Every structure is written in C-alpha cells, then in structure tokens.
C-alpha cells in the first residue's frame, strides 16, 4: 500500500520553519543593533565629557588672567595654551602608556604598552581607545595647568615649559597608574573616582613646590603686612570659575565612562547632583567662615569663588559613592579648608598667586579622606583612603620640588628682579595684552 501524500502538512511545516529562521535572524539583528546603539551612545557621552573637560582650560585661563596684573596677562594665557599643546602630545607619545600599559615595569611602579595608542593598553571595554585617550588627555592637561596661576609673574617661560612636560609626561601618569591603571593603590582598595588626588592634589602640590622654591613676588610681604599686588579683572575670574563649574560636569559624570543602562544613568545623575551640591556648599561655607572669623571683614567674592572650586575638588573623589547630604558636608569642609589653607600660606609667607594649593592640594586630600568617612560602599576603607591621600601628594611634591630646585640652581627658574618689575608680558613675549609689541633688553 503506498503512503498517503499530505501536501498541506508539508506546506504548514515549511512555513513554520521559515518563520522560525526569520525570527532568529531578526532577533540577532535586533541584538546587534542594540549593541551598536549602546556603543555609539556611550562613546558619544565620553566624547562630550572630554570636550567639557578640555574647555575647563578656558576657565583656568580666565580665572588666572583675572587675578594677574596687566603686565603678566599674556604670560599667564600663554602658559595655559602651552599646557594643552604639550599635554596632549606627550600624553599621546608615552604618558597614556605609562598610565594604562598592561606590562608592569619596576614591580608595577608604572606600566608600559608602547608608544601612542596601542592594543597593549588596559582600555575600558565598550569604549573606543581613541575617545578613552582623549578623555584622559584632557585630565592630564588639567593637572598641569593648576600651577600656572600660582607662579604668576616670577617664572621664566622656558622653566614652565620643562615643568609642564615633566608633570604631563611622567609625574601624573605614574601616580595615575597606581590607581586607574590597576596598580598598587587600586589593589589596596583606594578609591578616587574622578581625581581629587590623582589630578588636583598632584597639580596643587606641584604648585606648592614651585612657590616654596621660588619665594614670593616682590612686594607681596612687607614685615607683617600682606599686599595683594592688585589684579585686573574680577569679572574675568568669576566667569572663569563658572566655566570650570560647568566643565566639572564632564570631569565627574564623564568618569562613569558609560551612560546606557539604568545603573549607569542613575549613577551619572547622582554624580551630577552631588557635584552641584558640594560646589554650592563650598562657596557658602567659605564666605560664611571668612566673614565671621575676620573682624570687620566684608563679604569677599574671591574667597567665595575659591570655596566653590574647593567644593568641586573635594567631591571629585567620592561623587559616585556618597549621598546628597554627605556631598553637602564634604563641600562645607572643603570651603572652610580653602580659607584656612590660604591663611596658612600667608602666615608662612608663601606666595600662591591664585590659591592653587588650598583649593586643589588641601581640598584634594580632604576629598580622598572623605570617601573613607562618607562612602556608602563598605569596601572603601578609611585606612586605604588615608594612605592614598598622603602618598600621591608626597609623590607630586617631592618630584616637583627636585625639578624646580635643579632649575633654580641652573638659574633658569625665576626671572631677575628688574624683569619682574617690568612684567613678563614684555620680558618674555615682547607684547602686552592689548597686542602692542615692545622690545625689552636687560
């Protein structure tokens, strides 16, 4: 007996198999599309953050130019410009590799992965190595430019060129490797989310080393009297601080390194709010503390501006892991420290032109320690935070002190008194801020 034919059944079975294959192919396509969109959004997020951090250079330039005298404006702006140019190139050549190289050198003192952006670097999964480098290079330039305002009116431009190259190409990447490159501080459990210590205290203590070696500007201290020496534009400085504040939304939220997904999105928003609260609290705390403790002192705008910056620096280490209320407390302490640090420098007759050490150095240390006090993550131990908060500033100060001391011995660090009185715009660059070119011979 011949088997019966079931043409309808065959058609139905064929249709079901075809539908199944189409469904699988469509699911694979949708999965691929979701992955590609996630990749694109996260990389675009980090690119935008990198641009904001790079734009902070404009904030530093405006802040420092406003606090300088008319005769040193071009010099201050030139140094900020140079920091970006030399910073990105040296960080590309070998700084990035020293910081994130997968091959440990000298027992993990720093890493190495070859020159430029190579495949031997500890790149973040899901990010283009190119945009990861761009974000990190903007950080490196930030660490370098902190010193610019502190040394205003005193340092030879050639000495600043040497300093900027050394801190960007060597000092910052090496200490950065200890934490962000997976080095010994990372293994210890030290937490510095966006660089209270790795960026700001490095720059702040480099500034302290510079001003200690060079000494104060002519006329800054006369007996018990402290002279301001004048500044040209409080408007410029105020604008600079607000540019820095806006740039910090690339600095801190950008350090999450991803935006897609509920966890990444919520953490990014927490970081942004904590950054805002700490900055505001720092400004008000500095204003109130200075106003109350200084007899007959009127409310001081510059003190408030530095308090805002202190609050921003202080929250940078733990902005991802503390509550909103803790962020306010961190900002309050940072604002007070910015005032106390300035008073301490004045008492010691140390001339920091913009308060770089109180704001970035001292508040950077506080930011690291604050993680151990306020973090909601039980793995963030106070002991590890204290170690990192002492070692990183010590590294920056010792290396930079040695560099500045050697340059001072060579006679290439501080300008002559006659040159300082004329101003570095004319002495070093032969032009004024108005664009007038003037020859100078000493």
Curated annotation (Swiss-Prot):
Keyword Nucleotide-binding: no
UniProt superkingdom: Bacteria
Protein name per UniProt: Putative ammonium transporter sll1017
PROSITE patterns according to UniProt: AMMONIUM_TRANSP (PS01219)
Pfam families: Ammonium_transp
InterPro entries: Ammonium/urea_transptr (IPR029020), Ammonium_transpt (IPR001905), Ammonium_transpt_CS (IPR018047), NH4_transpt_AmtB-like_dom (IPR024041), RhesusRHD (IPR002229)
UniProt GO BP: ammonium homeostasis; ammonium transmembrane transport
UniProt organism field: Synechocystis sp. (strain ATCC 27184 / PCC 6803 / Kazusa)
Localization: Cell membrane
Main subcellular localisation: membrane
Gene Ontology CC: plasma membrane
Gene Ontology molecular function, alphabetical: ammonium channel activity
Stretches that traverse the bilayer: 5-25, 44-64, 81-101, 104-124, 133-153, 155-175, 193-213, 240-260, 269-289, 299-319, 325-345, 354-374, 386-406
Gene3D superfamilies, per the entry: Ammonium transporter AmtB like domains
